[in-house]
Amino acid sequence: MAGSRRKSPGITPDILLRAYSIGLFPMAESADDPEIFWVEPELRGVLPFDHFHVSKSLAKTVRKKPFEIRFDHAFDQVIAACAEETSGRPSTWINRTIRSLYSTLFDMGHAHTVEAWEGNELVGGLYGVSLGSAFFGESMFSRRTDASKICLVHLVDRLRERGFTLLDTQFTTEHLKTFGAIDVPKADYAAMLTAAMESPHLKF
């Protein structure tokens, strides 16, 4: 995790939004660790809207509409699912403090979810933070094949439709790179972020 890290003795929702506006985001070492630290990567993960790529097979799956897609329907369930340990994710950085903070951001209209439902069962989803014309993706989970990927496709469609200019993924992963995510140097990211913060806060 290249970049600067600094511990924070206490974070309020307003401080959290201010941090996002200047390029910082919080993490914990583990779900059981009460400490939170700020992260500012040297290379920032960004998913450019004009280079967003969906494979033919995934596009075909999306068209079949295997799940009901909902927005902002079950925030606490989504972040709880993202915090769960799984075989592919034995540890998580989402602790109780982070869950509480983002739940408050949801109540304030700054945190949002995209959810995949199969009947009455939540089977995939993602959450993130909106500020200005930027959306900061935080975490995702999947309990069915392609569920989180389909949520990402719907997220990008939604952000494009609403006029967002920046989709920040924090870091890039091989998974996100298949969608077109790139690493952006800190200085270039700062310019992109400044432009997004000059925008009025967009409706998600």
UniProtKB/Swiss-Prot annotation:
Pfam families: Leu_Phe_trans. It catalyses: N-terminal L-lysyl-[protein] + L-leucyl-tRNA(Leu) = N-terminal L-leucyl-L-lysyl-[protein] + tRNA(Leu) + H(+); N-terminal L-arginyl-[protein] + L-leucyl-tRNA(Leu) = N-terminal L-leucyl-L-arginyl-[protein] + tRNA(Leu) + H(+); L-phenylalanyl-tRNA(Phe) + an N-terminal L-alpha-aminoacyl-[protein] = an N-terminal L-phenylalanyl-L-alpha-aminoacyl-[protein] + tRNA(Phe). InterPro entries: Acyl_CoA_acyltransferase, Leu/Phe-tRNA_Trfase, Leu/Phe-tRNA_Trfase_C. The keyword Transferase applies. Gene3D superfamilies: Leucyl/phenylalanyl-tRNA-protein transferase, C-terminal domain. One of its GO terms (cellular component) is cytoplasm. This is Leucyl/phenylalanyl-tRNA--protein transferase. The gene is aat.
